[in-house]
Structures are given as C-alpha cells and as structure tokens.
C-alpha cells in the first residue's frame, strides 16, 4: 500500500479518429504498438539459458570437422531452434499462460484472503495462549518435574569391581 513509485509497464493508446461510438469492434494495427527492441526478460530470469550454437556445440582444435559441415550444422541448429520454438510457442504459450494466470490468481487469492488473516489471527491470539501455557506449565508440569527430580535425587548407584 502507499504511493506507487514505479512506472507501469502497460500503456493504452487511443486515437480520436480510430475511436468509434458504434457497437462494432475497431481493432488497432498490432504492428503499431509492438516495439521489436523491447526487452522481454528485464529481470534476467532466463540468463542461465544458453541456446547459442557456440554455447551448445564446440569442437576442440585437434578435432575439427569440415568447414561445410560446421556451417551447415550451425545453420540447421539455428533454423530448427527458431522454427521449433515458434511452433511450440504457438501451441503452448497461450494455454500455459492461461494456466499460470489461473495458478497465480488462485495462490494470490489464498494468500490474501486465507493465509494472511490466519497468520494475523494467530499472532493476535498468541499472547493469550502464551499466558495460558505458562500457567499450565507452572501449575502442572513444574510440580511433576520437581517431584520426579526429588525422587530420583535420592537414588544412588554403587558399582563394584568383583
């Protein structure tokens, strides 16, 4: 809570001429709003993910393949990585984003409406519980331990080496 100091990542662009008051939907041109230079991993969550050809495939100096093989394998690696990644994102990105959204919304709801109130309630009740526990300890457990200690203090063991 409090004053927001960070800029929002989401912006809404609306031109007066493209805004229509009729009931039909007027879709904007997506190319107009997509910035190809945008950093999609600003917090470097996937900085350890190495997908460059040189990071995955390397030949030592003593065992080089033919130059044409190296060039073709590099090209095939990059093309297959690009095509398969695009293919997988087309079919998996939206359902996984939807599932992750549901999961995070559920966890947020549970955290906000169940876990935090439960913890706050426990923290409110703990001083009373602490007082009751101290009284139970002083009335019941302390006398039992004291009497057991006195009983066992009179026991003596003598060992003989015969």
UniProtKB/Swiss-Prot annotation:
Record PTM Phosphotyrosine, positions in chain: 19, 27
InterPro entries: Caveolin (IPR001612), Caveolin_CS (IPR018361)
Ranges lying in the membrane without crossing it: 87-107
Pfam (any one): Caveolin
Processing and modification events after translation: Phosphorylated on serine and tyrosine residues. CAV1 promotes phosphorylation on Ser-23 which then targets the complex to the plasma membrane, lipid rafts and caveolae. Phosphorylation on both Tyr-19 and Tyr-27 is required for insulin-induced 'Ser-727' phosphorylation of STAT3 and its activation. Phosphorylation on Tyr-19 is required for insulin-induced phosphorylation of MAPK1 and DNA binding of STAT3. Tyrosine phosphorylation is induced by both EGF and insulin.
A cellular-component GO term for this protein: perinuclear region of cytoplasm
Membrane topology designation: Peripheral membrane protein
Domain of life the protein comes from: Eukaryota
Record's subcellular location: Nucleus; Cytoplasm; Golgi apparatus membrane; Cell membrane
GO molecular function, one term: protein kinase binding
Topology Cytoplasmic: residue spans: 1-86, 108-162
Keyword Phosphoprotein in record: yes
Modified residues (Phosphoserine): 20, 23
One Gene Ontology term from the biological process aspect of the record: vesicle fusion
Keyword check for Membrane: yes
Keyword annotations from UniProtKB, A to Z: Cell membrane, Cytoplasm, Golgi apparatus, Membrane, Nucleus, Phosphoprotein
Binding partners and assembly: Monomer or homodimer. Interacts with CAV1; the interaction forms a stable heterooligomeric complex that is required for targeting to lipid rafts and for caveolae formation. Tyrosine phosphorylated forms do not form heterooligomers with the Tyr-19-phosphorylated form existing as a monomer or dimer, and the Tyr-27-form as a monomer only. Interacts (tyrosine phosphorylated form) with the SH2 domain-containing proteins, RASA1, NCK1 and SRC. Interacts (tyrosine phosphorylated form) with INSR, the interaction (Tyr-27-phosphorylated form) is increased on insulin stimulation.
Family the UniProt entry places it in: Belongs to the caveolin family.
Function: May act as a scaffolding protein within caveolar membranes. Interacts directly with G-protein alpha subunits and can functionally regulate their activity. Acts as an accessory protein in conjunction with CAV1 in targeting to lipid rafts and driving caveolae formation. Positive regulator of cellular mitogenesis of the MAPK signaling pathway. Required for the insulin-stimulated nuclear translocation and activation of MAPK1 and STAT3, and the subsequent regulation of cell cycle progression.
Entry protein name: Caveolin-2
């Amino acid at each position: 809570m409090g004053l927001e100091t960070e800029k929002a990542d989401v912006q809404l662009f609306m031109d007066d001429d493209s805004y229509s008051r009729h009931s039909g939907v007027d879709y904007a041109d997506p190319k107009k709003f997509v910035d190809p230079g945008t950093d999609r991993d600003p917090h470097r969550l996937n900085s350890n993910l190495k997908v460059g050809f040189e990071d995955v495939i390397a030949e030592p100096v003593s065992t080089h393949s033919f130059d044409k093989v190296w060039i073709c394998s590099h090209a095939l690696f990059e093309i297959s990585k690009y095509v398969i990644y695009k293919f997988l994102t087309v079919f998996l990105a939206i359902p996984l984003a939807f599932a992750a959204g549901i999961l995070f919304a559920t966890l947020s709801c549970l955290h906000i409406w169940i876990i935090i109130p439960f913890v706050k309630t426990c923290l409110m009740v703990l001083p009373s519980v602490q007082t009751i526990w101290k009284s139970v300890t002083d009335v019941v457990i302390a006398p039992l331990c004291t009497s057991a200690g006195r009983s066992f203090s009179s026991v003596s063991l003598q060992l003989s080496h015969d």
